[in-house]
């Protein structure tokens, strides 16, 4: 096998595929590095694709043999049987029929196709993410995948909604229980406040009674104090009267002494009286 430079890629034109590779396969049975395989035997993603470094990514080339479909008509059996959970499908070409012409051929020249030239075809498969599974993909595959995805999503959504309903019912039950507990607490608080109000009322009544009794006691005490003060005032007045009488009596005695001894000096307390009218000889 010829060794190609590193980085070489198999990028033939449609005309090159027909003139070189398909013609060599039909006339000389030379397939080079293109494998012969019935690509319609299974799903495209389950085929034993070759790993050829010359092919571009997600691109493959195969020689596909034709089969008889009644009489001498040769065609490709495109149906894929059901497998697993899939209902099967049909291969189809996305490009349709396209004529490949050699620009060097002149008008009138042609090649009559014999039966031998119709026993094999050259197929190119490409994987397209945004479009179909591949250029010759199954028609029903994407529909089944979409249906399965929608069914799974619907099941998940239903489970989520059921879980949401269960959570809402639980939250509602919790709120109901909390409301009942709160109501019970408030009722207990009211029952507790009523005895406290009664106790405060009784305490106020007792305090009022005590104050009234204290006032009643203060009134006799004030009356007793008034009588005592009057008695003290009378005693003080009597004492002052007695002192006044004593003073008057003492003054009378002093006058009598002065009268009886007019020429003598008398010492009366701290006072000394001298008779200046007397002259010593």
UniProtKB/Swiss-Prot annotation:
Compositional bias of kind Basic and acidic residues: 94-109
Classification via InterPro entries: NAC-dom, NAC_dom_sf
Ranges of biased composition (kind: Low complexity): 229-239
Gene3D superfamilies: NAC domain
A GO-annotated cellular component: nucleus
Residues of the DNA-binding region: 109-162
Region of interest called Disordered, as start-end residue ranges on this chain: 84-109, 211-249
Keywords: DNA-binding, Nucleus, Transcription, Transcription regulation
Domain of life of the native organism: Eukaryota
Molecular function in Gene Ontology: DNA binding; DNA-binding transcription factor activity
Record PANTHER family: NAC DOMAIN-CONTAINING PROTEIN 82-RELATED
Domain observations: The NAC domain includes a DNA-binding domain and a dimerization domain.
Name of protein: NAC domain-containing protein 6
Gene from which the chain derives: NAC006
């Amino acid at each position: 096998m010829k060794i190609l430079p590193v980085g070489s890629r198999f990028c033939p034109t449609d005309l090159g595929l027909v003139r070189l590779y398909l013609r060599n396969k039909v006339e000389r049975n030379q397939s080079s590095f293109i494998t012969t395989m019935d690509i319609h035997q299974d799903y495209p993603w389950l085929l034993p694709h070759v790993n050829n470094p010359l092919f571009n990514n997600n691109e493959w080339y195969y020689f596909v043999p034709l089969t008889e479909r009644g009489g001498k008509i040769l065609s490709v059996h495109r149906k894929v049987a059901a497998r697993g959970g899939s209902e099967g499908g049909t291969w189809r070409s996305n490009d349709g029929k396209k004529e490949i012409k050699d620009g060097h051929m002149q008008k009138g020249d042609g090649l009559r196709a014999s039966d031998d030239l119709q026993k094999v075809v050259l197929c190119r498969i490409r994987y397209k993410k945004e479009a179909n599974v591949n250029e010759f993909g199954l028609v029903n595959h994407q529909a089944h995948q979409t249906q399965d995805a929608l069914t799974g999503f619907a099941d998940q959504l239903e489970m989520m909604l059921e879980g949401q309903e269960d959570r809402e019912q639980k939250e509602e039950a919790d709120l109901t229980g909390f409301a009942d507990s709160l109501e019970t607490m408030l009722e207990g608080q009211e029952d507790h406040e009523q005895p406290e109000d009664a106790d405060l009322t009784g305490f106020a009544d007792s305090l009022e009674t005590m104050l009234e009794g204290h006032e009643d006691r203060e009134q006799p005490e004030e009356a007793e104090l008034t009588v005592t003060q009057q008695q003290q005032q009378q005693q003080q007045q009597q004492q002052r009267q007695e002192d006044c009488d004593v003073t008057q009596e003492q003054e009378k005695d002093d006058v009598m002494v002065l009268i009886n001894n007019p020429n003598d000096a008398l010492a009366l307390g701290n006072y000394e009286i001298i008779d200046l009218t007397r002259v010593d000889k």
